[in-house]
Design a protein with these regions (language model features):
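ABC transporter nucleotide-binding domain
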Residues: 111-144
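ABC ATPase nucleotide-binding domains
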Residues: 1-123
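Short aromatic-glycine-enriched beta-strand elements
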Residues: 146-147, 202-205
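Short, structured beta-strand/loop micro-motifs enriched in basic residues and often containing a Trp
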Residues: 154, 211-214
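A short macromolecule-binding patch
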Residues: 158, 214-217
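Glycine/charge-rich catalytic "coupling/switch" loops of P-loop NTPases
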Residues: 117, 132, 146-197, 221-253
Length: 253
């Protein structure tokens, strides 16, 4: 009994609830009940743990603290855990491998690093933060692995196989907002800035193009006004080439 009591207090300390060990469940908040449930699951030291959105009722800072604790427990005890969440950062931070599911089917199973850099298709790309997905076709194959590709509306850019690997005749290019840079010179994808928002370290621009609304980031030193015509240049470090598939010309809401 003493060992069980000791183990229970240890788990309550891990979830930050030891000071409320004697409080009745009816006197606990939703977030506190969630942490108690987590402690109950951990205290029996199971070889396999199943978590279904265990941190959903916690505030942002506590969520970060708790996922660190869960990861430490996994690694210390060599436990296997299946963890269900819609939070990308949460999934990546505690996992050795992540499965992305669509309509009940696994569409990609990989390490967090591979998922983040090389999504298998447009669905996975959107889940891991590629907000801009554009169909393209190759119009010219140049020297040194470079290709000229054209987007809807006629904008053309040069891509390199050194950055993307083999580039198909038709495909999708997916970019994160930091992968598109506004350029007043008009190079890249032709757009008009529809909305500018200040994020602190950068400005975010919602740019209207023939292919729909694209989200880009720009320096705070040289902001552009709404209504400005700009070209968007593509940074391959924050972009990926995907297999061609039919997608909506407008961003999902």
């Amino acid at each position: 009994a003493a060992e069980r009591q000791k183990r229970s207090i240890e788990m309550l300390e891990i979830v930050g609830m030891a000071h409320l060990a004697n409080r009745l469940p009816s006197a606990l908040s939703g977030g506190q009940k969630q942490r108690v449930a987590l402690a109950r699951a951990l205290v029996i030291d199971p070889p396999l743990m199943m978590f279904d959105e265990p941190l959903s009722n916690l505030d942002a800072k506590l969520r970060v603290d708790m996922r660190v604790q869960i990861r430490r427990l996994q690694m210390a005890g060599q436990r296997t855990a299946v963890y269900v969440t819609h939070d990308q950062e949460e999934a990546f931070s505690i996992s050795d491998k992540v499965a992305i599911m669509d309509a009940g089917r696994v569409v990609q199973l990989d390490t967090p690093e591979v998922l983040y850099r090389r999504p298998a298709n447009a669905f996975v790309a959107r889940f891991v933060g590629f907000e801009n997905i554009l169909p393209f076709r190759v119009v010219d194959r140049l020297a040194n692995g470079k290709v000229s590709v054209e987007f809807e509306g006629g904008s053309r850019v040069i891509l390199s196989s050194a950055d993307f690997g083999e580039i198909p005749d038709r495909g999708l290019i997916a970019t994160r907002p930091e992968g598109l840079t506004p350029d007043i010179a008009g190079e890249g994808i032709t757009t008009n800035i529809g909305l500018r928002t200040f994020l602190g370290r950068s400005y975010q621009y919602h740019c209207e193009s023939s292919a729909g609304t694209l989200v880009a980031l720009g320096s705070i030193e040289t902001p552009f006004e709404a209504g400005t015509a700009v070209g968007l240049t593509i940074n391959p470090l924050h972009s990926a080439i995907l297999p061609f598939e039919a997608i909506s010309s407008k961003k999902d809401t």
